[in-house]
């Protein structure tokens, strides 16, 4: 289970979804749970997504 605190700690620099997945849960091949968490965090304004580079950042 991926937690918000772990995601925020992994976002020490802007990262793409797949590289975040490799840092947080490399054994899980599906990015669905992480993507769902990132979207909820984006709604809460904790993270931002740069559409041009495809990377997630801390807000």
Name these PLM-found stretches.
Residues 1, 49-59:
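Short, cationic-aromatic polyanion-contact patches
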Residues 10-19:
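Short capping segments at the starts of secondary-structure elements
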Residues 45:
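Glycine-centered, phosphate/nucleic-acid-interacting loop/turn motifs that mediate DNA/RNA or nucleotide
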Residues 21-31:
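Short helix-coil junctions and helix-kink-helix linkers
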Residues 35-39:
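Short, hydrophobic-biased segments on the C-terminal half of alpha helices
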Residues 1-8, 31:
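Short, leucine-enriched amphipathic alpha-helices that occur as contiguous helical runs
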């Amino acid at each position: 289970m991926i937690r918000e605190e772990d995601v925020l700690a992994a976002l020490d620099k802007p990262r793409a979804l797949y590289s975040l997945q490799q840092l947080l849960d490399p054994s899980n091949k599906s990015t669905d749970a992480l993507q769902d968490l990132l979207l909820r965090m984006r709604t809460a304004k904790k993270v931002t997504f740069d559409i041009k580079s495809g990377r997630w950042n801390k807000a």
